[in-house]
């Protein structure tokens, strides 16, 4: 599959994300809020689908990067999805050692703590970038969400923290509610070209003002979208 993408003209391959172990801890932080009241109704067994496993483990992911590098001549970009400083550093280094030409940091964080300030959340993002940049030599692109009070300023801070690129925008998992079973159910809805407009707007605003490369994700479906 990867070789066929190169044959079709792809300039680089961005791998799907390796989810850092701290994500499991984050799901448990969110879980109490979503499972509240599940024992109040006989039909409500669980409001939140358990995240017991991922599609591939860390070792298999690293092996896949090595195999991809051996199979193609174009750059292979690893992707790491996580939160904690220690885990980010460990897997960032291992992804580089596996042969990745660059790394995408896909920071996925849902701040459910009402005592946590916006400043503290922003600092956590920036600290992650600094810690990873201090450990790897390959370029690091940060995949971010638009949910910052001042995204333009945050983009500049990401660059100051060492980001070589910004990928806009992360698409958070948004489950649905089954009113009959009183459960939270997965409901993955694919994007359309309309979803690209927010990213296009911000790239147009920031291009030339923030010295960083931009990449747009979500909503790019046709060659017109690419142009």
Predicted segments, located by residue:
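Alpha/beta enzyme core
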Residues: 2-42, 47, 56-217, 221-227
């Amino acid at each position: 599959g990867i070789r066929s993408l190169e044959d079709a003209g792809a300039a680089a391959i961005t791998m799907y994300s390796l989810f850092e172990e701290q994500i499991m801890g984050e799901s448990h932080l969110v879980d109490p809020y979503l499972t509240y009241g599940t024992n109040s109704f006989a039909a409500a067994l669980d409001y939140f689908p358990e995240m017991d496993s991922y599609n591939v483990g860390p070792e298999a992911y690293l092996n896949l990067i090595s195999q991809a590098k051996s199979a193609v001549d174009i750059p292979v970009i690893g992707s790491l999805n996580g939160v904690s400083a220690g885990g980010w550093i460990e897997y960032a280094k291992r992804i580089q050692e596996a042969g990745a030409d660059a790394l995408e940091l896909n920071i996925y964080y849902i701040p459910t703590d009402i005592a946590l300030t916006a400043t503290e959340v922003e600092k956590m993002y920036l600290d992650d970038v600094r810690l990873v940049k201090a450990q790897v030599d390959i370029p690091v692109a940060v995949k971010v969400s638009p949910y910052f009070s001042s995204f333009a300023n945050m983009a500049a801070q990401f660059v100051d923290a060492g980001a070589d690129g910004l990928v806009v925008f992360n698409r958070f998992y948004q489950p649905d509610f089954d009113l009959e079973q009183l459960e939270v159910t997965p409901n993955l809805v694919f994007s359309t070209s309309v979803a690209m407009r927010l990213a296009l707007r911000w790239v147009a605003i920031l291009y030339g003002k923030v010295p960083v490369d931009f990449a747009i994700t979500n909503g790019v479906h046709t060659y017109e979208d690419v142009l």
